[in-house]
């Protein structure tokens, strides 16, 4: 590649002083290398550098969208069956591309440089849109999964905090269910004693039901 750039730079430097030598350098390099090693802005027939003085450039645009082609496109979008002639016309419209025509004034030959067709550009546009959608799609499930995990955690947490679903294991500092039942029976007994004290008008007759005795029993 460096040799190619060096020869092209040397040929451009010799165009004004010795154009024949410049053409010879370009021809010698192109004849000893592959076809894809041709120089840009160079005539492939006479190896003359194509500049504004010795070349003519024209642009042949691609086929325009006519009302007839628009009608055929609408029919195709509605899944209507098209004839062979109509299908061929649509294919010609989609495969049409702009052409750059460069005519060399030295050898009077024209070089054609074809552009990209409409079908290629539409496929490229759809592939870019698909790639952009594929890049953006993995982020959405992650966010949804994160939201679902948060919801599930909150649901499980709320369920775990409910007293009906928790299983409380007694520790060393806590009382067992037997002790709790005993305390409940004691409370009932004390409540009955207090009720008896309040209901009786004279407590002196029964010393076992004295209010001081009740408080000391607590």
Curated annotation (Swiss-Prot):
For bias type Low complexity, the affected ranges are 130-146, 161-172
Question: Matching InterPro entries, A to Z?
Answer: DUF4674
Record field: compositional bias (Polar residues): 147-156, 173-183
**Source domain of life:** Eukaryota
Region: Disordered; residue ranges are 130-192
- For the keyword Phosphoprotein, the answer is yes
Q: In this chain, where does the modification Phosphothreonine occur? A: 140
Q: Where are residues bearing Phosphoserine located in the sequence? A: 126
Provide the alphabetized UniProt keywords. Phosphoprotein
Q: Which residues cross the membrane?
A: none
**Keyword Transport applies:** no
Q: PANTHER family under this entry? A: UPF0711 PROTEIN C18ORF21 (PTHR31402:SF2)
The UniProt similarity line reads: Belongs to the UPF0711 family.
The name this protein carries in UniProt is UPF0711 protein C18orf21 homolog
